[in-house]
């Protein structure tokens, strides 16, 4: 469709319009006689072989030039007619940040005998804070109680009740028992494994919105990689036995974990982040630092922003 554009023309260059803007004579007074016709200047952008100039009154010739509008259709490129792409309204985007495990069922033990739950809680709280600071005010931190299995069912139910647009579960990694070695820490023998390290991102292909889950997982993994963090490659290796998982993207470290309850049973896109290995002695120290928590939480926020923008553009306001 052609768009209409109004082009400016100087009044002095449009003598044929002058009669339209002159006032009519007052009653009882004769109209002023027009002076001898003067040739009007021809605009440089108009080429005329024999310009014809109508007479111009002395009064109108004294007026200062003003912008007038000349109508005429002008074709514009399609890009000029395309509406601006909508962007996400973070205040309407609901995210559940799930703290993996519970105080009663603490998950893996770190190389220094700290429950995984404590690491999960600290990182999840930092993620919640940064998301809210960036406008995602509907973010909810999900803390559950009790034993592991019952806790998983509660997480799924809570996310559904909150009508979340995205479910993100926060965990820290360990290794199968067969890889553990012993060392002494604070006068006691502890288990450790420095063999593996890095983050990993999991989705379930049985999630009702698997493709969208995978889309967010890819964004999150790319942000982790952009910060220079390596991903845990061991989950695709036969040595992991029953802990082995299909690698969906070897560039970013996205795996499928099809039967995990919080990924399979949730009714919204769901992703699990293993932020790093706490059974690796060096990596545990990094995971315990505020600097690493800031890096990971910044990556999560960046991924959520991109994800929200894309969903908003496709589905419209939530």
Positions of predicted regions on the chain:
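Catalytic-site microenvironment of enzymes
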Residues: 1-318
């Amino acid at each position: 469709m052609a768009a209409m554009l109004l082009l400016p023309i100087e009044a002095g260059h449009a003598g044929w319009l002058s009669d339209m803007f002159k006032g009519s004579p007052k009653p009882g007074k004769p109209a002023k006689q027009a002076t001898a016709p003067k040739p009007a200047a021809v605009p440089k952008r108009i080429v005329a072989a024999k310009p014809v100039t109508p007479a111009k009154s002395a009064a109108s010739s004294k007026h200062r030039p003003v912008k007038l509008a000349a109508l005429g259709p002008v074709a514009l490129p399609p890009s000029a007619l395309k509406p601006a792409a909508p962007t996400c309204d973070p205040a309407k985007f609901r995210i559940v940040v799930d703290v993996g495990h519970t105080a009663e069922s603490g998950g893996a033990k770190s190389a220094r005998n700290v429950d995984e739950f404590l690491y999960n809680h600290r990182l999840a709280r930092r993620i919640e804070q940064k998301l809210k600071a960036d406008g995602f005010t509907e973010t909810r931190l999900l803390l559950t109680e009790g034993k592991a299995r019952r806790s998983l069912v509660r997480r799924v139910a809570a996310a559904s009740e909150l009508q979340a647009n995205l479910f993100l579960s926060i965990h820290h990694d360990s290794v199968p028992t067969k890889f553990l070695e012993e060392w002494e820490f604070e006068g006691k023998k502890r288990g450790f494994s420095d063999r593996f390290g890095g983050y990993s991102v999991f989705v379930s292909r049985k999630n009702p919105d698997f493709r969208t889950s995978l889309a967010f997982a890819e964004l999150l993994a790319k942000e982790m990689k952009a910060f220079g963090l390596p991903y845990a490659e061991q989950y695709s290796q036969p040595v992991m036995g029953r802990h082995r998982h299909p690698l969906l993207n070897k560039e970013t470290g996205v795996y499928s974990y099809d039967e995990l309850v919080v990924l399979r049973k949730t009714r919204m896109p769901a992703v699990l982040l293993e932020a790093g290995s706490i059974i690796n002695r060096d990596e545990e120290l990094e995971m315990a630092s505020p600097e690493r928590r800031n890096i990971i939480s910044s990556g999560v926020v960046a991924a959520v922003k991109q994800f929200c923008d894309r969903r908003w553009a496709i589905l419209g306001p939530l």
